[in-house]
UniProtKB/Swiss-Prot annotation:
UniProt protein name: D-apiose import binding protein
Taxonomic superkingdom: Bacteria
InterPro entries: Peripla_BP_I, SBP_2_dom
GO molecular function: carbohydrate binding
Signal peptide coordinates: 1-26
Purpose: Part of an ABC transporter complex involved in D-apiose import. Binds D-apiose, D-ribose and D-ribulose.
The keyword Signal is annotated on this UniProt entry: yes
Similarity section: Belongs to the bacterial solute-binding protein 2 family.
Keywords (A to Z) from UniProt: Periplasm, Signal, Sugar transport, Transport
Binding site for D-apiofuranose: 39, 115-116, 162-164, 168, 218, 243, 263
Gene3D superfamilies found in the cross-reference section: 3.40.50.2300
CDD domains, sorted: PBP1_TmRBP-like
Localization (cell): Periplasm
Length: 312
């Protein structure tokens, strides 16, 4: 009888401990949702957010939506079911993601967006993004200068549903189009993909062998274009990217790529977590919903200081 009572007491204590632990985890859980970590930019922001959240004492779940809005919606459901108290989100489309962020808000979970805005305000608590237009103008000026203000060039743009693709393209053209001897002979999407950019660049070289430059909407496309140019023995073609990845840093040091634009992924991710922490503790971030972080130009002169999307 005494043994039976001991087992009952032990079971009750175990259940109490499990319940308390589960409650504590839910009270301290931050969900971090980004596109695929195959792109080093998204991996860097997820890793940075994860590390900062843990340093502040939070548990985390790190999830990947692969730029699929339906999958993103399911992951938000997962965050809700797990009792997350905040979501750090690099979203899967400026329009398609509105419903997911609204769903999180309806469940009482604040969202803190990084890298990509949504086409709505008042739903997310914060939208912390790189100043893509300002950064693209930096890249555009470097590109024009490298080509001596003249020559046929190609633009590789990102995924159409991503608002950043259009903003960067506009920033580039608002600079480049001021120079009448700069002629764009081809503009194609490579959907942020290195593999796709390689294939696109191979085809473009066949129809436009006189191309002098390639300006890309991100670094993975710049790397794909650079690889295609290298295979074609076209080391004379100037390539400029956008992101600030370690791969492009190394390519700049090898003279394979001329420049890139650093968008500070680590800084935005850190800011998002710290603002989430403050919001959960005080009910306010103390900052406006929409926040822009300026970008920096990376060339051979400062590439050695670049590491994991930050100048060290």
């Amino acid at each position: 009888m005494k043994a039976s009572k001991r087992w009952v007491a032990l079971a009750a204590a175990t259940l109490t401990l499990f319940t308390a632990t589960g409650t504590a985890q839910a009270a301290n859980l931050i969900a971090i949702i980004t596109p695929s970590h195959d792109n080093p930019f998204f991996k860097a922001e997820a890793d940075t957010a994860n590390a900062r959240a843990k340093a502040l004492g939070y548990d985390t779940i790190v999830l990947v939506h692969d730029d699929d809005a339906n999958k993103q919606s399911n992951l938000v459901d997962t965050a809700i079911a797990r009792g997350a108290k905040a979501i750090i989100l690099d979203n899967a489309g400026s329009e398609a993601s509105i419903s997911a962020v609204r769903k999180a808000k309806a469940a009482g979970i604040p969202s803190f967006l990084i890298d990509r805005e949504i086409n709505a305000t008042g739903i997310a608590v914060s939208q912390i993004v790189s100043n893509n237009y300002q950064g693209a103008q930096l890249g555009g000026r470097a590109f024009v200068k490298a080509l001596g203000e003249k020559g046929n060039y190609v633009e590789l743009v990102g995924r159409e549903a991503d608002i950043n693709a259009g903003i960067r393209s506009k920033g580039y053209h608002d600079v480049i189009d001021q120079f009448p001897n700069m002629k764009m002979v081809e503009r194609q999407s490579a959907n942020w993909s290195q593999t796709e950019a390689y294939r696109v660049m191979e085809t473009i070289l066949q129809s436009h062998p006189d191309v002098k430059g390639v300006i890309a909407g991100n670094d993975t496309m710049a790397m794909g274009a650079s690889a295609a140019l290298k295979a074609a023995k076209r080391s004379d073609v100037i390539v400029v990217g956008f992101d600030g990845s370690n791969d492009v840093r190394d390519a700049i040091m090898r003279n394979d790529i001329r420049a890139t634009v650093l968008q500070p992924a680590a800084l935005a991710a850190t800011e998002a977590v710290e603002q989430a922490d403050k919001y959960m503790k005080t009910g306010s971030t103390g900052k406006p919903e929409k926040q822009l972080i300026n970008c920096s130009l990376i060339t051979k002169a400062n590439a050695g200081k670049l590491d994991m999307f930050a100048l060290r």
